[in-house]
Amino acid sequence: MDENREVQGTPEADRRPVVTIGAEQLHQATETLQRYKQGKTNLEKRVIDNEEWYRLRHWACLRAESQKQQVEPVSAWLLNSIANKHADAMDNYPAPNILPREPGDVEEARRLSDIVPVVLQQTGFERTYSEVWWDKLIGGTAIYGVFWDGSKLGGLGDIAVEPVDVVNLFWEPGITDIQRSADVFYVRLEDNAALERAYPQLAGNLGGSTLNVSAYVYDDTVNTADKSLVVDWYYKRSGQSGTELHYCKYVNDTVLYSSENVGTPWYDHGKYPFVFDPLYRIKGTPCGFGYVDIGKGTQEYIDRGDQAIMANMLSNAAPRFFIRSDGAVNEQEYADWTKPFVHTNGNLGQDSILPVTGRGLSGIYLNVLEQKIAELKETTGNRDVSTGGSTSGVTAASAIAAMQEAGSKLSRDSNKAAYRAFREVVELVVELIRQFYDAPRQFRIIGESGRQEFVIYSNEALRPQAQGVAFGVDMGYRVPQFDLEITAEKASPYSKLSQNELALQFFGAGFFNPQMTDQALACLEMMDFDGKEQIMQRIAANGTLYQRLLMVQQQAVAMAQLADQLGGTNYAMQMLGGGQAGQQPMPGGVPDIKADGGESSVTRNARETAASRATPT
């Protein structure tokens, strides 16, 4: 999407044609790209093989060319583990909460907390989040690309957050942080006709590239003869304001766009627009390894064991016979069970035809196979309790909940890592808003009361702000900075039910009674749950309002007593009899919410607790 950035335009004075990136620089960049590609050859091969394992086509990786006719059973134990991990991730879909660092940025942080989720929704981030999680579980690495797409909204431009395939991205070998790479290359195949329409200078210059990228094994026949590799080259240079990020888009030896030639850095934040989220880290690379790498060895032995058992079953199920060469039996008629007569020549002896006696497998082989299945579940953290089941003999709800809590530790750990990557994504989104949201835009948000609200927003409050003059010294400019708090949307129905029941328990305990404000706040300080701060603020506000009401009533009674003394009226007694608030009764009869299926409250509470504990805090 970065290639559309240039439609934003810059003043002509800032677009002086300073030719810094030319054919020679492109040749050097391509050599660097080739060196980077050689450095990640093993990674690309592993990722492509893992994709075949995920698609249950791993026999293509196991069998030899001479064994294509063998029995090839495929079991989906590893796939089931990956699918459950993906479901856990989507049940804990992240939501950003932007917090100010200075008192003057409180209002802007609140507005960003409302607008950033809308921006992510408009760019289809939920689908991106799902795609990168598949990449993370299968290949071991999820990569986000946070770009500015100048073609969106009729040329106004907007943010694009997309999944990036690790096969198409190249960086300096040996580094762990992508931001420390000297150069980063993002390579994609694009249609020649589309390129010539967008860039007329490419006419007759396409084809003959020495570059190539690794490809997956597709179901369809993919013809790349009419396609060319387009390289997005990102690199950093030292500038007046510090480290500057530059961008060059080229095909073969033709420059399509160069920010350095234009004379303006690409993104003001100065970072590569890529965020890595590895599952299990590996030293010396920003990538990691996934569940396919962990479980494919065990899955191989499971399928090979199934292969031996199935081959034995088929050989024993189909009758076979020994036939003497001089037995004079018509083999075709004997093998055809529909023919009642079988012709023979001469005498038929007892040893002319003998059935082949098969041998059944011992039960120990089935036991080993079951142990391998249990090993795969154990090593991938996909035991029965984590998928809603329980081991034999365990029926108590508290015991099941305890096992589910222990089984969700791996999910909580991987979700926390995903939230750290999501925090970096949101930081880049805020920086792009700071740089490009010059024109006011309108957003539909959900207000505090749950109603739709329409707000107009621009980056005016995010731009550098003058701090004035103090003691004759210019204090310069301040750039508003924010902290990010990542929480999980309650996608699990049991988590939602648990949150709703907690609110009813607060209501039943009188937490929202303004006369019990101090007791309620003291109790809440000892508790820990999502949204605790908002509840405490609401209860404190109710208590403050109640105290003010009492003060107003006392002043009104005093004024009424004074009026009674002067005019002989009885206003004070009337106000004391019907105007002063009395002790409010404790709420009672709070209805009990039952889960579908009429299960007991003990079981329901245990399941809700287990569902909420799967959410990282």
Describe each region flagged by the PLM.
Residues 1-11, 107-307:
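Extended, regular secondary-structure scaffolds
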Residues 73, 85-112:
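Nucleic acid-processing catalytic cores of prokaryotic defense/repair systems
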